[in-house]
Amino acid sequence: MREISYNKDYVKLDGGFYFAQGVFETILIKEEAVFLEEHINRLNKSIDIMGLGEHIDIEFIKNFIKQEKLKNIVLKIVITEKNIVFSTRKIKYSKKDYKNGFKLKLSSVLRNPTSMMTYLKALSYNENLYEYNKANKEGFNEVVFLNIYGNIAEGATSNIFIIKDKKIYTPKISDGILPGVVRNWVIKNFRVCEKHLDKEDLYSADEVFITNSILGIMKIVQFEERSYSTSMVERIRSEYEQFII
């Protein structure tokens, strides 16, 4: 039986504390939790892969959200062998962010697609955070990781899409990316080609956007020194926002 903690300082000491042996999901809650089933399914798959014990029951999560009256907030669920930790935070992205768009920077760190950890939301997130924070200090909103073969993988906190000649492309999961929930929504609702992409594809793209569960869909206005138009991305984002109302 896991210890349940909500916005508390106390947890049981286990491999999650000593070795970052744990997984997490970050869920957007508006009037209701967005993509809750998809998040819990992915969480339980991660629990199996990491050998962390029993699954999380989606009804338990629904009841927790209802009991705590959570709305218009971000819920993070962390699972270790002995703990389930809930925490909440405000939704940090503003209308101004979506109006202005984001700027991307290439990271010098390479993703390893042969590592299973690449495909999980595991607690060992230091590399992502270090590169993300470094880019922020340099005036960028997100970084782009290539993998060891030179293909585009993902951002520190996001999946990446490019648009060329009105066609949408995104890296294959096998290039070393987290199979994002919003990424999957885009693939299901638009004609998207999953293929190997490299940094030259970013330079030659007409438009670029990134996705994650809290951000939703964010247009990219600049990669390094390359600027982009955003008209098609704006339409995709509009459809997504209508979907999650």
What residue spans do the PLM features occupy?
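Helix-start/capping segments and mature chain N-termini
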Residues: M1-Q67, T80-I245
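Short secondary-structure capping/junction motifs at helix and strand boundaries
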Residues: L70-K76
